[in-house]
A protein has these predicted regions:
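Hydrophobic faces of well-ordered beta-strands that scaffold small-molecule active sites
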Residues: 19, 65, 91-93
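Classical nucleotidyltransferase
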Residues: 102-154
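Short pre-active-site segment immediately N-terminal to redox-active cysteine/selenocysteine motifs
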Residues: 22-29
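Conserved acidic residues
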Residues: 18, 63, 109
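Short Fe-S-cluster ligation motifs
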Residues: 53-73
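N-terminal [4Fe-4S]-dependent radical SAM core
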Residues: 1-22, 35-40, 154
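Flexible loop residues that form catalytic
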Residues: 38, 70, 115-116
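Canonical radical SAM enzyme core domain
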Residues: 40-53, 72-106, 110
Length: 154
């Protein structure tokens, strides 16, 4: 599994500080998706040792490990989701698909689904087609992102 890089984000999973991993290989080609900018960026191998070392460095600073993609590498993704849970982190997957395999879903705490459609907007738009779910409770948390939308100028 290859990735573009990792980062710490505050707003991509409600009530969590997340360490993100942007995984190489999405083939959905959603119009205006931020992934388009990443296609020419350098990539790195995300083996289990590097993954474990990286998330352990952030222990106590982040509460969730978030994968932007990776469902196209199900066995590797599942292995990393299990490692994250074993180390006490919650897990999240952002996918452009409408659903993911049950074998992946059972290792997630949160899941964002749906392609990015520019005319509908992303999660911060009330008209979005995307959904953000707490997998454990089944609660749809999408509306929590709407308060993050920039105010419209009059």
């Amino acid at each position: 599994m290859r990735y573009y890089g990792s980062d710490v984000v505050l707003a991509d999973v409600p009530d969590e500080i997340s360490l993100t991993f942007s995984i190489v290989g999405c083939r959905l080609n959603c119009s205006a998706c931020f992934w388009q900018e990443l296609r020419s960026a350098p990539t790195y191998e995300l083996d289990d040792e590097l993954f474990t070392d990286t998330i352990q460095r952030y222990r106590g600073l982040v509460s969730c490990v978030l994968f932007y993609g990776g469902e196209w590498h199900p066995l590797e993704l599942i292995r990393k989701l299990k490692l994250a849970h074993q180390l006490g982190f919650k897990t999240c997957l952002y996918t452009g698909l409408s659903r993911v395999k049950d074998s992946i879903l059972k290792h997630l705490d949160y899941l964002k689904t749906g392609t990015y459609q520019e005319k509908l907007g992303g999660l911060s738009s009330p008209t979005t087609n995307q959904k953000f779910i707490n997998v454990n409770s089944g609660e749809d948390l999408t509306a929590q992102f709407w308060q993050l939308a920039p105010a419209k100028r009059k």
